[in-house]
Amino acid sequence: MKLNSQDLEKIADLTLDCYNQNAEHFWEGTRYHDVSQNIAAMLQYIEGDRPFTILDFGCGPGRDLRVFAELGHVAIGLEGAAQFAAMARAYSGCEVWQQSFLKLDLPENYFDGVFANASLFHIPSQELPRVLLELRACLKPGGVLFSSNPHGHNEEGWSYGRYGT
């Protein structure tokens, strides 16, 4: 079933509302998750000299954003949920852009890496090719897009108040 623009807006709004309402609980449940292997996997494939300019796509409360900054990189977060964006700024000290994943406004050829850890699965499947092209366009030549997503059951729809694919 093809989703229209109103359906897509509703999906984004309700998912972001869920995260905004549960931001502190989510943070307490994920603050100490170790994703160092994911960070290392992306960084090892970026060519050129460090520091790299990294976009943490769906940065949440800023856990990974802070790690990139502590490693000496220029880290910028992108987050749709206002509560998470504020938390990420406070926790990481990094710049955070608040944008919907479905309405991105990204500079072209700007980032050495895009780190999309447990975030792209929130994009409805019909929109995913477009969003991936936009993420590709924001990468410098030779830039790396890293994506990791939670294991699911190959279903698209609502789960715990959030939309996922």
Protein language model regions, located:
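Class I (Rossmann-like) S-adenosyl-L-methionine-dependent methyltransferase catalytic domain
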Residues: 1-57, 61-105, 126-130, 134, ...
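A short acidic, Gly/Pro-enriched loop at the edge of an enzyme's catalytic core
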Residues: 102-114
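Helix-to-beta-strand junctions that scaffold the AdoMet/dcAdoMet cofactor pocket
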Residues: 123-125, 139-140
